[in-house]
A protein has these predicted regions:
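Short glycine/serine- and small hydrophobic-enriched flexible loop segments
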Residues: 44-45, 84, 188-192
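N-terminal beta-alpha supersecondary unit
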Residues: 1-66
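DPxDG-like acidic metal-binding loop motif
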Residues: 59-90
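Oxyanion-binding and handling regions
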Residues: 1-22, 34, 91, 95-215
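Short amphipathic alpha-helical face segments that pack within enzyme cores
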Residues: 38-41, 77, 81, 98, ...
Length: 215
């Protein structure tokens, strides 16, 4: 199976192309793409450097956030357009599954995933043994309580900083290990999702149209 992998919710574009469980292209190692935000340029590079064509792609996997909404929407729209124009299945993957897997692989611990939303709110979830739970859109007090409740048993992924908040007696806030997944990690998650996930022609980015939960 030829897979096109698209990740951008952290605001850093990365594209991969794989044949089965073997990566054929990873944009991270292409210095000519460094700093570019042109999704089409990344996809063209993936095909030109791998020798593959869009007609050979069996599935497009795209990071649907949560994260930077503009970047995520752009990449999801491009994935949907590719799928529609070429009759290719599109599968959306939760960004917290990607960064959760990445950090769990490195630390061998459950992972609390956090990213900022519209101030002062945050997205948060717990990734543990391949499962994502507690995903919610919360206020700052709730996310801080969640962090304190897990800081001795979990690792952290995403992007957050509570430095403006006075340190409590519990000590300093933990630091996220990573805010994006390597393309090899993305591929592992994608292939597992392919076995169980719904294959559609259109996916949607995770937005802030959620009820804010407060403590």
């Amino acid at each position: 199976m030829i897979s096109l992998l698209m990740q951008n919710s952290a605001g850093l574009m990365s594209i991969g192309l794989a044949d089965g469980d073997q990566l054929l292209f990873d944009s991270v190692v292409d210095v000519d793409l460094a700093g570019s935000r042109n999704v089409e340029a990344y996809v063209r590079a993936a095909f030109s450097q791998s020798g593959k064509t869009i007609s050979e792609v069996d599935c497009v996997f795209v990071d649907i956030g949560p994260g930077g909404l503009g970047a995520t929407r752009t990449t999801v729209a491009f994935a949907n357009a590719l799928g529609f124009a070429n009759s290719i299945s599109v599968i959306g993957i939760h960004a917290f599954e990607l960064i959760g897997y990445e950090v769990a692989k490195l630390t061998k611990k459950p992972v609390v995933c956090i990213r900022p939303a519209a101030r002062p709110n945050h997205y948060m979830a717990l990734y543990d043994q391949g499962n994502l739970s507690h995903f919610s859109f919360v206020d700052i007090d709730t996310v801080q309580l969640f962090v304190r409740g897990h800081q001795h048993t979990a690792s952290f992924a995403g992007k957050f900083s509570f430095s403006e908040v006075l340190e409590a007696k519990e000590g300093p806030w933990p630091t996220p290990v990573a805010n994006s997944a390597s393309m090899s990690s993305f591929l592992v998650v994608a292939l597992e999702k392919y076995k169980t996930g719904a294959r559609t022609s259109r996916v949607y980015p995770i937005s802030e149209n959620l009820v804010v939960n407060s403590q």
